[in-house]
A protein has these predicted regions:
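Extracellular and secretory-pathway beta-repeat/beta-biased strand scaffolds
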Residues: 1-413, 417-475, 479-536, 540-563
């Protein structure tokens, strides 16, 4: 028949309905469409009202006439086999259930009620596929359409009594996918949307979850996996409490922007996140209980953003961590460009290793490690205005320039090694509970700057300015080597031996003192105007020229001056 209309219940062992302008083989029901004759097409190939239910062991419906739809408003139940529907137009389906598989192919598909397959469900639509209420299957569900719109529940791995099994896979393939409801798989969930996936307020959940495609909008949405979660997209918007979470491993990569402001991306055992630009600000979270790895050309973690894990590795072009946090037992941060950590925090329980072109840690920025701390910069470390580098273990800072003025602090409960072409510690503090080493070019420790070590101090620089209340102090031995030292009004002191190898020393009103022996080798030594050179042990001075007018060179032991 060309069309069929059902207004009453229809019962059969096997129900086959074939409509359209066809030649149908009686044995196989193979339909061969006839050429169009110009006659008017029916509005619907099959029209089943709410009273027109179909009940059979197996059901097969075929509508071959192009553009002519199938409307099934009544119940459809296949108690012993499959339901197969082929429509060349739009299919509108109300309630359907099969003991076996459900297979649908149509120009467009609209599921308005509850649809269940006791086997697998396979639906293909040339245009759109809409699910308004529920689609469930005991086994696999495979959906393919140009556009998929789910406002209800699509769930694979559901027994007829609604218990969950462990073998339901859900696969969706589309150009665009909109999910305002729930997509659930008891085993693997895979969603591919080549253009865009809109999951605003929706949820995707599976034992494993894979999302692949164009732009992913997960604002207020959830992607949840017990096992691996893998997301690959051109861009991702995970704002407004968006959640991507795996109880195992999560891999999230975008070719463009990843916006996680106020969102969460979590892989409890392992997290890997990669993007061109990654914005994790406004209390965004990238976290793992084990390993977290982040890569981006630009990472923004400001405004209480957090990147955390047992082992955290961030490899970026630039990093804006103003007011943000990077926290781990072991923390490695590598930036080819600049890092801004003003009011930010890098914190490690074991070791913190930071490498970049430059670091702005001023204004109470903090790098803290309960173990070792290493900072390596090609350019400037700006640690002014109460910036802090703190470590319980050894601390090594290698920079082009250090600006530690106005309350900047480099502190180690172990050794502190600082090297730079320029070290500006005016009004700052360098302190080590073990040894302190400062090497490089110009070292400016004026204006109340303090550099001290409890187990010895070694300073080898091109020049040292320790004037105007500067303090260079050692609880042990102090070794000083410089071409020029200015110590007017400053203090250089050691509780152990002090040895200074200098080009020149100008310390009018300054102090160069040791509680043990003091040795000075210099070209020019100016100790005038109340300068003091003193030691409890012996003093040995080798100099070409000594000016001690109104100065003092004294020892409780021997004093030897060779000038």
């Amino acid at each position: 028949t060309r069309s069929a209309k059902l207004n009453a219940k229809l019962y059969a062992k096997n129900l086959n309905i074939v409509t359209g302008r066809n030649d149908v083989q009686a044995d196989s029901l193979q339909a061969t469409p006839r050429a169009a004759d110009g006659s008017e097409k029916p509005q619907l190939a099959i029209d089943s009202s709410a009273l027109g239910g179909m009940y059979a062991g197996a059901i097969r419906l075929v509508g071959t006439e192009q553009g002519v739809g199938v409307k099934l408003a009544g119940d459809m139940a296949a108690s012993g086999g499959d339901i197969r529907i082929d429509a060349s137009g739009k299919l509108s389906l109300a309630q359907a259930s099969s003991q076996g598989d459900l297979k649908i192919a149509a120009q467009a598909v609209e599921l308005n009620g509850k649809t269940y397959a006791g086997g697998s469900a396979e639906i293909r639509s040339a245009e759109e596929l809409v699910n308004r209420q529920s689609l469930a299957a005991r086994e696999r569900i495979a959906l393919e359409a140009a556009h998929i719109d789910n406002a209800g529940v699509i769930e694979a791995g559901v027994e007829p009594d609604e218990r969950r099994n462990a073998r339901g896979d859900l696969e969706l393939r589309s150009g665009t996918l909109r999910n305002a409801g729930s997509l659930v798989a008891s085993r693997a969930l895979e969603a591919k949307a080549s253009q865009a996936l809109d999951n605003q307020g929706g949820s995707l959940k599976g034992a494993t979850v894979r999302v692949d495609g164009g732009h992913l909008d997960n604002r207020g949405g959830k992607l949840l996996a017990e096992g691996e979660l893998r997301v690959e997209a051109s861009s991702l918007d995970n704002r407004q409490d968006g959640l991507l979470q795996s109880r195992d491993r999560a891999v999230v990569k975008t070719r463009g922007d990843l916006d996680n402001r106020g969102g969460q991306v979590i892989g409890l055992n392992d997290l890997e996140v990669g993007a061109a630009t990654l914005d994790n600000g406004q209390q965004g979270l990238l976290g793992s209980q084990q390993s977290t790895r982040v890569s981006a050309q630009a990472l923004v973690n400001r405004g209480d953003g957090e990147v955390s894990g047992k082992r955290v590795e961030a490899r970026v072009g630039s990093l804006d961590n103003r007011g943000g946090k990077l926290i781990g037992d072991d923390l490695l941060v590598v930036a080819s460009g600049a890092i801004d950590n003003r009011l930010g925090l890098f914190s490690a329980a074991n070791r913190l290793d930071l490498r970049a072109r430059s670091l702005d840690n001023s204004g109470k920025g903090t790098l803290s490690s309960r173990g070792g701390l290493e900072v390596s910069l090609g350019g400037l470390l700006d640690n002014r205005d109460e910036g802090n580098l703190l470590s319980q273990g050894a601390q090594r800072v290698t920079v082009g320039q250090l600006d530690n003025r106005a309350g900047g602090l480099l502190s180690s409960r172990s050794e502190l090694n600082v090297h730079g072409a320029s070290l500006d510690n005016r009004g700052g503090v360098l302190v080590a509970d073990a040894g302190l080493s400062a090497t490089g070019g110009a070292f400016d420790n004026r204006d109340g700057g303090s550099a001290s070590g409890k187990a010895g101090v070694r300073v080898e620089v091109a020049s040292l300015r320790n004037d105007q209340g500067g303090k260079l102090l050692s609880d042990g031995r102090l070794d000083l080597a410089a071409n020029a030292v200015g110590n007017a009004g400053g203090r250089i002191a050691a509780k152990g031996d002090l040895q200074a190898t200098l080009g020149s020393l100008a310390q009018q009103g300054g102090e160069l003192v040791s509680e043990k022996t003091l040795k000075v080798a210099a070209d020019v030594l100016d100790n005038s105007q109340s300068g003091l050179i003193a030691a409890n042990g012996g003093i040995a001075i080798e100099a070409r020229q000594v000016d001690n007018r109104a100065g003092e060179i004294s020892s409780t032991s021997k004093v030897a001056v060779n000038a």
